[in-house]
């Protein structure tokens, strides 16, 4: 740490170099990804626009039809306007206007066959402990890899696993 009065401070952190072998990066994983075999429709509800755009791109590339909304109120409107089935709701848990849990509860009444996957930047234990989500509910903590998301989706929708490249 180096500091000068009215000039600020600088911090230098030295980390050891990683000498192991690297795993496949998300970019490499995405390049090798095979599209899903089905034509399922997913309603993606995420209040962070950058995350919503990235997930939409990934899921479309993987063969899914994507409906999207940036909050629960908008998601209810999108779902009501969509005549076909919605196979999966992927929703952030903590959002303005309406939580992901309340959204899911309302949509399941209208679409009882729809599956739900909750995503959040909060840890699963904290969410369950606070009563925000029931223990055992399908949940994926952020950040997550493309592969982890696709595996979870395939499991929830009973799709065959993504082929390995």
What does each model-found stretch correspond to?
Residues 71-74, 99-103:
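Acidic catalytic/metal-coordinating carboxylates
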Residues 56, 68-88:
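Acidic, metal-coordinating helix/loop segments flanking the phosphotransfer/catalytic sites
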Residues 102, 106-141, 146-155:
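Alpha4 helix (beta4-alpha4-beta5 surface) of REC/receiver domains from two-component response regulators
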Residues 53-61:
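Charged docking surfaces used in two-component/phosphorelay signaling
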Residues 47-49, 145:
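Two-component His->Asp phosphorelay active-site signatures
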Residues 1-42, 49, 73, 115-118, ...:
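C-terminal end segment of the histidine kinase catalytic
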Residues 95:
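Receiver (REC) domain active-site loop signature in two-component systems and cognate sites
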Residues 92:
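Active-site residues of response regulator receiver
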